[in-house]
Amino acid sequence: MRFRPPSGARTEPPAADDAAAWITGAVPDGWLTEPPQVVVDRDEIIIWGRVPTPELGAESTDADRSAAQAGRIHQFREDTRDGRIKIALQVEHRYQRKVSWGVRCGDTQELFTHLSAPVMTRLRQPERQVLDTLVDAGVARSRSEALAWCVKLVGEHTEDWLTELRQAMTRVDELRRQGPAA
């Protein structure tokens, strides 16, 4: 039976500090080219594995390489399905979190199945503060709109831009305080 969190009051799952080591030991030799990368949060454990990149001739195009990598990922998914399910059930029982699998091959990656939950329930306080900053600054009308905006804007300069926006808002607040009394 798959793990299902109890309804009602939220309880913290057990610590998963050793999850990466446990999962590395549970994954059969030969499945992956390196130890799996394990990402843990309160709700889910994602196991990322890297599979060998297919060898193609020198004349192959980027499209050929992409197709070969997608094919390798698909084959891994099919060949290891029963074993991955068995490991996932053990991990879910041990750590009381849902388990998802993802595979990387060359430049291609695919997350097979993953926990789907309402976005706002999964955000931590720092993420909500980013959304609130965008709403307060008038960039978005709601947290949902701010989240959609963030997804479109994600890039290397996002943090710099948010810092500048917060500084500008601080300056606006200072100017409001200096203004005439109402």
Q: What would you call each of these model-derived segments?
A:
Residues 143-162:
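Short, basic amphipathic alpha-helical segments that act as recognition/interaction helices
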Residues 126-144:
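Surface-exposed, Lys/Arg-rich phosphate-binding patches that contact polyanionic backbones
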